[in-house]
């Protein structure tokens, strides 16, 4: 009873470039996945075992690249099922001054993913993001090895119509369809 409330106000996220007050009626949720691909029991010298022992880092990158198209859409069957942006919502989104070019300039990117027609519309869809990769050694620690493991951290951003367990199961099914065991 003490925590009962009519409203929750969160002051978070980027301000619109117009600097005008903005009401946001929800934020995307999150589901997280740790994906590991295993190779040899211990790292092996690539000069001795390259072309014989499969490299888990290469295999992991192939799994990850199979999840999205070159234009940024998740291509796992069913990922966007049930997501509907009504004409009314699209109309409201189009009234928001576009920040697409400003975001590109500020973040120093040349192109954007083509999940939707605009930034505002794109955040109405669930997303699949690789937030981290780890395998072997790089930089001053570089070694000529086939690593024993490769790991990716993935976040799936959820919208109202998204069922996190359904999306995670779709990802699992996709990975299994590539011949991997989960």
Regions found by a protein language model. Give the residues of each.
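Short acidic (Asp/Glu) and glycine-rich catalytic loops that position anionic groups and cofactors
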Residues: 39-43, 148-153, 182
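Short, conserved charged micro-motifs
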Residues: 161-167
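Short, intrinsically disordered, charge-balanced linker/junction segments flanking boundaries
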Residues: 1, 177-182
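Fold-level recognition of mixed alpha/beta catalytic cores in primary-metabolism enzymes, strongest
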Residues: 1-111, 117-126
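Short amphipathic alpha-helices in soluble, non-transmembrane regions
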Residues: 167-176
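Short, glycine-/Ser/Thr-/acidic-enriched flexible segments
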Residues: 14-16, 40-42, 135-137, 157-161
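Short alpha-helix boundary/capping segments
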Residues: 48-55, 142, 146, 159
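A structural supersecondary motif
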Residues: 112, 118-144, 148-150, 155, ...
